[in-house]
C-alpha cells in the first residue's frame, strides 16, 4: 500500500517548482527516484528495465532507446517500466498490457495518473492493481514532478 509511503519517500509540496516544470518545454523523461524504485523492488524483485538510459537503468538487464524496448520480448520477466511521458506512452502501456497477457511478464508501470487519456482507458484500467501515492514525487535535486503518479501493475495471465 502506498498510503504510508509518502512520509518515508519525501513527498513534494513545492508548488512554485511544479508550475515552472509544467510550463517548460523540456523532454518527457523523468528518472525514477531511487527510493521509489527500492520500495517497489522489495515487493516485485525486478529483472528488466525496458526503457531507460544507461545512466538511469534500475536493473541489471535493461534496454535503451537504441535497443528499442518496445521491439524486445519481455517474456517471463519482472519488469519495472518508467516510460517517456510524451505521446509514445500509449505504445508503452500497450506493450506492458500485452506482455503480461501473452508472455507471462509481470509489469509495474511508474506513470502519470492521467485518467483522462485514451491509453489510461484502453490499458491502465485493465491492470490487476492501480496505486496512487498521496503526494507528488520528489526528485533527487529537490524539485518535484509536476503531475501525480500512479503505479500500475499488470500481472501475468495464469
What residues fall within each predicted segment?
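Class I S-adenosyl-L-methionine-dependent methyltransferase catalytic core
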Residues: 2-158
